[in-house]
Amino acid sequence: MTTRLLPAQVQEPVTFRDVAVSFSQDEWLHLDPAQRTLYREVMLENYSNLVSLGILFSKPKVIAQLEQAEDFPMVESGMFQGVYLGWKSLFEPIVSKEENKKVLKNQRVDKFFNFILGKTCVNEEQLEEQPGNKKNPFSEMLLSVRRGCRQERGFPGVGLVRNPGIKLPFRRKPGVAAGGGKPHLQQYSVLFKQLGFNRARQLCKCNICGKVFFHSSSLSKHQRTHTGEKLYKCQGCRKAFSQRSSLAQHLRVHTGEKPYLCSDCGKAFSFTTSLIGHQRMHTGERPYECKECGKTFKGSSSLHNHQRIHTGEKPYKCNECGRAFSQCSSLIQHHRIHTGEKPYECSQCGKAFTSISRLSRHHRVHTGEKPFHCNVCGKVFSYHSALTIHQRTHTGEKPYACKECGKAFSQSSALTQHQRIHTGEKPYKCAECGKAFSWLSRLNIHHRIHTGEKPYHCKECGKAFSSHSAVNTHRKIHTGEKPYKCSDCEKAFNQSSALIQHQRIHTGEKPFNCKVCGKAFRQSSSLMTHMRIHTGERPYRCEACGKAFSQSSSLANHQKTHY
């Protein structure tokens, strides 16, 4: 059964954390098979006790496994806490039910089960004082074992509670005294005798953090956590580890070995920690809670990563550009921007991506899947981000504001493009003529000047244009539509740019200045024509006589002399 080491005079409850035995993984590997069966025996003994009381419950899956196997599923972790946490999580829900509490109370063993679940402290006086307790097999067992343990020498002032058929699985944690007293490193359970630990042996203490070990070899291994020394290297990827057992686990990454199987769905894992985390998907258990926002997680690593949202910590820094990230996986994905690596390839079209999430999103192009629905208009989208942006057309939300002029946008990309008006940045350059543009769409339209491509046709007259906006402007000639009206003189225009130029007549504004002579103009085209006076450029040539002119209007006037 379960044990408790506690000075006899102390009556306060002590939790399992105070009395747990823990071994390093390497220490666990030194135990013989008979000693390892301690896990199995503790679990099965407590199960049998509940069954003997007549409490009805279906046999847990783990019990059926333990009845058939000698090894407890968590032996690789090397932690005896696994025994307790295993059977506590198994039995506590059973004995905590109201109907079962009554059975336990009627059988006068409620105190016993409260004790083994770490809820109360049990001593001989408490057991003796209850009428009829001596006839109870559980209480009688506790009393006889306590008396028997007193006869064992070398453990003065220490009370033990033990099932005679079970070796003692728990002891008081080294260096922790009950009741807040000084550390008592000499208080050991009989378990340590059985495992070959001598009470008089000198313990090995780390002079950096104070942690205590039974073997000098274990202390040496532990100290590598302080020095950063990593003696064990993987021949496959050269990754190094401080312990041989850690290297052995890592090698499964290369071999593909997955010895830990989920009994619910059959999925296999390389590490016990991965299996335990996975099993929480089936149970729904999320034991790790964020103290800031209350959000819960299946694994401690997920909680740790989440907490960086609150702290703002970004420990993973890119050596190329200095950008920092809160998660290692984000840094790895970011690195691919610099290396150009795209390891995730679409089996349908061969297109490659930097992350598996982007490949998953891309797959929807082929499947046509659009799982994100707008609850206002019913429109569907392939991506959640696209739905979010779309919903702003209904709400009118424009969360991205320009700090220069205050103009707001519904998309961050639109704000980024807009800011180039203020910065003058033109990152998109034409490979043909070197002309630069602020927006990629403008560069694509410009390319059509070189290719001659005019994909947009007027349905009225068939005239072709290089851009969609150009054909829309042209159509207003056929419709007579002039939606842009001057507020000063009521003159109307079919283009907004024509109205802006016209309004400069009223305002007198001449924003285009000649850098040579300082002369100002209302239109950029007028400035370009004027600049030819200084450069001597004459691009308009008469085909009849070869004479050249700086303006097309001058050429037109000259050509009249030939007719």
Swiss-Prot record:
UniProtKB keywords: DNA-binding, Metal-binding, Nucleus, Repeat, Transcription, Transcription regulation, Zinc, Zinc-finger
Localization per Swiss-Prot or TrEMBL: Nucleus
C2H2-type zinc-finger residues: 204-226, 232-254, 260-282, 288-310, 316-338, 344-366, 372-394, 400-422, 428-450, 456-478, 484-506, 512-534, 540-562
SUPFAM superfamilies: beta-beta-alpha zinc fingers, KRAB domain (Kruppel-associated box)
Claim: DNA-binding is one of the keywords in the record: yes
GO CC list: nucleus
Pfam family for this entry, one: zf-H2C2_2
Gene name, Swiss-Prot/TrEMBL: Znf879
PROSITE patterns to which the protein is assigned, alphabetical: KRAB, ZINC_FINGER_C2H2_1, ZINC_FINGER_C2H2_2
Domain KRAB: 14-85
Organism: Mus musculus
GO terms classed as biological process: regulation of DNA-templated transcription
Listed name of the protein: Zinc finger protein 879
Gene3D superfamilies: 6.10.140.140, Classic Zinc Finger
Family note: Belongs to the krueppel C2H2-type zinc-finger protein family.
The UniProt record lists the keyword Thylakoid: no
Recorded GO MF terms: DNA binding; zinc ion binding
